[in-house]
A protein has these predicted regions:
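Outer membrane beta-barrel
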Residues: 53, 58-185, 298-307, 311-333
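Membrane-spanning beta-strands of outer-membrane beta-barrel proteins
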Residues: 49, 103, 161, 206-208, ...
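Cleavable N-terminal export/targeting peptides
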Residues: 1-25
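Transmembrane beta-strand segments of Gram-negative outer membrane beta-barrel proteins
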Residues: 23-41, 71-73, 81, 142, ...
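Membrane-embedded beta-strand positions of outer-membrane beta-barrel proteins
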Residues: 30-32, 71-75, 119-121, 168, ...
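Outer-membrane beta-barrel "beta-signal"
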Residues: 366-378
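Short loop/turn motifs that connect adjacent beta-strands in outer-membrane beta-barrel proteins
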Residues: 21-29, 42-43, 57-71, 116, ...
Length: 378
């Protein structure tokens, strides 16, 4: 009788242990984010921009296979009411405004964690891994999300474009990390005749590689410092407008250029964010950004920005952030200065509201923009 009781208890414990293992497995995750943005140049013109993002991750362990790996899928759709932008600024004051785009693959690939190393292969975009620091992510100007020394000089996988990529991340320790991303040298618009976002053509498009080392402070004050470089090699140089050319036209231009001359282009960047003060719910910090590219082969040669972020100033909790940033971009034909003042308030875990004001001077042209962004996510 005693043996039977002990045996029964052992079976129960083993079954409970098995259940714990099952419940500990990662489950698939699905998220939806809808962003609405209203833009106005103070009464003359209006624009309404919509961005819908659907994302899913499926752990391999959930499929009964190995651990620490997952399939990643994300699709986006963009719609706006005005075909023309309400401002002619070069840096682009809205980081979500693009031409209308039906659902398009944004991320599609497989990632594997091996110790301190993360590997990814598939369709990807640079917005997933670079220029995503906490302070910079607050602002709505496109230059804060990716510097114009990259977005204006390369046809790279920048929102809403994606390209085939091999991505690697390595955490040296809790403070220092390294990233490297190797992309096809040109990103293509989806659903365009004669082009494919899954194109891998180094001979025609070249190769584009991004590398970055980051340092994060591990004390009570948040701080992030990044140093990066992008290198592009191909038979021809292009700019961001090339993404609207069909691949046949790009091929023809490539054949005209000498195949014997493999040309290299590059840009470097440096960014710093540091929280400087904290008292109760209040906190304040500063950020700085700088990037340069060779002036003899690029449209945008210099970019510099500086600003501050203040939390808890306008609400009873730290669910709000007030940001001010000034940026200057030097292009081959004009210099542009932009000032953004924005406030982001998190109403709930699923709802945020963010008004922003942009004051821009592009050469002799001036633009004043007011916008309201609302984000709903689940």
């Amino acid at each position: 009788m005693v043996r039977k009781t002990v045996y029964t208890l052992v079976v129960i414990v083993l079954q409970m242990g098995e259940e714990r293992v099952v419940f500990a497995r990662e489950k698939p995750e699905v998220s939806v984010q809808y962003t609405i943005e209203l833009q106005s140049d103070f009464g003359r013109r209006l624009n309404w921009v919509n961005l819908l993002s659907l994302r899913a991750t499926v752990p391999m362990e959930w499929l009964g296979l190995w651990g620490n790996g997952k399939l990643e899928v994300q699709a986006i759709s963009v719609y706006k009411t005005s075909r023309e932008r309400i401002a002619g600024d070069r840096q682009v004051f809205s980081n979500i405004e693009e031409d209308n785009l039906p659902f398009s693959p944004f991320i599609l690939g497989y990632s594997q964690q091996i110790g301190k190393v993360l590997l990814f292969g598939g369709l990807r975009n640079v917005n997933e891994d670079y220029f995503t620091t906490p302070y910079a992510s607050l602002f709505t100007n496109s230059s804060c999300g990716i510097y114009p020394t990259l977005s204006a000089n390369y046809v790279l996988a920048n929102y809403p474009l994606s390209a085939v990529c091999l991505h690697l991340e390595y955490r040296i320790n809790e403070k220092i990390g390294i990233k490297n991303s190797l992309y096809n040298g040109k990103a293509y618009l989806p659903f365009e005749r004669g082009s494919s976002i899954f194109t891998v053509a180094p001979r025609r498009d070249g190769l584009l590689d991004l590398a970055e080392i980051s340092y994060t402070t591990n004390n009570s004050y948040h701080g992030t410092y990044n140093l990066g470089v992008v290198v592009h090699g191909s038979n021809r140089f292009g700019d961001a407008s090339d993404c609207r050319l069909p691949s046949e036209q790009v091929q023809a231009q490539t054949e005209v250029s000498s195949a014997k001359h493999w040309r290299v282009n590059y840009a470097c960047w440096l960014s710093a964010e540091q929280e400087c003060w904290r008292s109760g719910r209040y906190s304040a910090g500063v950020l700085g950004q700088y990037s340069f590219a060779p002036s003899d082969r690029n449209d945008c040669r210099r970019y510099v920005a500086a600003g501050g972020v203040f939390r808890g100033m306008l609400s009873a909790s730290q669910e709000d952030a007030l940001g001010v940033i000034f940026s200057q971009a030097s292009f081959s034909d004009v210099r542009e200065k932009a000032l953004e003042i924005t406030w982001n308030y998190t109403v709930s875990d699923h709802f945020t509201v963010q008004p922003a004001f942009h004051f821009i001077r592009t050469g002799n042209e001036r633009y004043h923009i007011a916008m309201l962004r609302v984000v709903v996510s689940y």
